[in-house]
């Protein structure tokens, strides 16, 4: 298997894992799932209602379906600070993420 083929297979695997996790989060607690993923209600509805066949087809994209929500260097650096305790880091992360805008369908 070539390096490109291997990378595409890994992208597909990550995509499928991400979509399945997203669906599980949304089905168990829609509001919390939307918060954790930073997505709009419209996008949450689309993701939650995908059939298995649609989910697998979408996962087969050659592009990553998830992306870093931490596109601010200072934010990412503060969350990765090894000097903080895990509990403080998680609380700080939740506070910072609550201030991030949700993604919408474009």
Curated annotation (Swiss-Prot):
Please give the Pfam families that the UniProt record associates with this protein: FlhD (PF05247)
GO terms of biological process kind: bacterial-type flagellum assembly; positive regulation of DNA-templated transcription; regulation of bacterial-type flagellum assembly
Keyword Plastid attributed? no
Give the record's GO CC terms.
cytoplasm
- Localisation: Cytoplasm
Q: Name one GO molecular function term.
A: DNA binding
- What is said about the domains? The C-terminal region contains a putative helix-turn-helix (HTH) motif, suggesting that this region may bind DNA.
Q: What does this protein do?
A: Functions in complex with FlhC as a master transcriptional regulator that regulates transcription of several flagellar and non-flagellar operons by binding to their promoter region. Activates expression of class 2 flagellar genes, including fliA, which is a flagellum-specific sigma factor that turns on the class 3 genes. Also regulates genes whose products function in a variety of physiological pathways.
Assembly description: Homodimer; disulfide-linked. Forms a heterohexamer composed of two FlhC and four FlhD subunits. Each FlhC binds a FlhD dimer, forming a heterotrimer, and a hexamer assembles by dimerization of two heterotrimers.
Can you tell me which family this protein belongs to? Belongs to the FlhD family.
Provide the protein name: Flagellar transcriptional regulator FlhD
Q: Which organism is it from?
A: Burkholderia pseudomallei (strain 1710b)
Task: Please name the gene that encodes this protein.
Answer: flhD
